[in-house]
């Protein structure tokens, strides 16, 4: 397989496609206009960014015979199934793990990235998310656009009035519950205790779908766990699975503990689906999502303010002012006990938070007839102007250093976190497809166990219990990759 892939890549680097074309104009030899289909994510489409991008590109290339159009396909359309029959997109925008899964199976073309305008502006760690090694030679199969990591979203106008006196022990101007998980737990607990509604379901603190291995990654990666180990050449070793490594059991303790302040919607995707509305109406104090969903929170909050009798213009402005996005609290309790008062804890009692992240970007289908035109589009879409516009419209964290610095604030912080290793990049190998179900199953079971306490039927109590749960994840992932594939 490796030899075949190398042969395909060498061929495609020299050129691909079945129809000859004039690379200077983009037109085919017969003089026809080249039309390339672009598959973007749903957020980019709903926000109007894709329309802006395509219109801008087409204006810039109108004299070169290249036209880009919306592929009009579902965000996660299967390139492997549709591509060979000519139904797939020419250019796709997706996360690094998905693109590289396609790349391993030869559905994506490698790109000479050092010839792109964005090359020098993107850090090596982001490029490496699209790196593949075949027969000792390195290829890159995607172009980074933005950095993804789980972020905390909240409404500034929902902060407690006394946070500066009661929730800022060090007086640094940042609430303690945004700096460490013990205080986030304590504040969330206080909100639950103050919920006097008839149903007791109107006031929650921190809320998230705890079964999600990506969004809940801080509960195991912060304690020394990892997804896959690495070989000497830097490539991932899918046989070395590390969910159970080091002190990850303590992180699972914390996950179960926090689940106890939520409701059973944390064991599935219920909270992921309702988080935009629940943040907007004040039911949730804060929640976890990714930077590219910022506009979805804004839309719901704007609507909330409108429903309170404010005009759309004022509501939109108020939403922009009050919706905040910040990185997750940077400190987790070393022993996994969130109930301890942080006032009595020292620096040695905490571990630094690590989250799973990803790099979303563009890739070119192996089945396109117009590789050169696709490269022109990708080069344009990853240029300074369009990445800046994407950042402005979608609230993304750009992979380009110049745009990150220009934007400043949280965007620059996320860029720095990636460079400093605080973000564990999702492995860019096909085997990553097999981690989700085993991890979701166990994380969901552990979260649900928090609701078994009242009936005396808890399954996960001791450190050994949590360790065995994590070992189950490792074992089931291994079986899915190797034993079941035979």
Regions found by a protein language model. Give the residues of each.
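Extracytoplasmic/periplasmic solute-binding protein
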Residues: 135-145, 150, 182-240
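Extracytoplasmic "Venus flytrap"/periplasmic binding protein-like
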Residues: 56-125, 129, 157, 161-167, ...
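Glycine-centered hinge/linker elements that transmit conformational signals in sensory
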Residues: 185-189, 231-272, 323-324, 328-329
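Hinge/lid segment of periplasmic solute-binding proteins
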Residues: 95-162, 182-185, 314, 322-329, ...
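Extracytoplasmic/periplasmic substrate-recognition and gating elements
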Residues: 67, 161, 306-396
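Conserved C-terminal helix/tail region of periplasmic/extracytoplasmic solute-binding proteins
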Residues: 387-388, 401-407, 416-486
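Short, solvent-exposed loop/beta-turn-alpha elements that line the ligand-binding surface or hinge
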Residues: 112-124, 161, 165-177, 225-250, ...
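Short, well-ordered beta-strand elements
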Residues: 31-43, 66-71, 91, 141
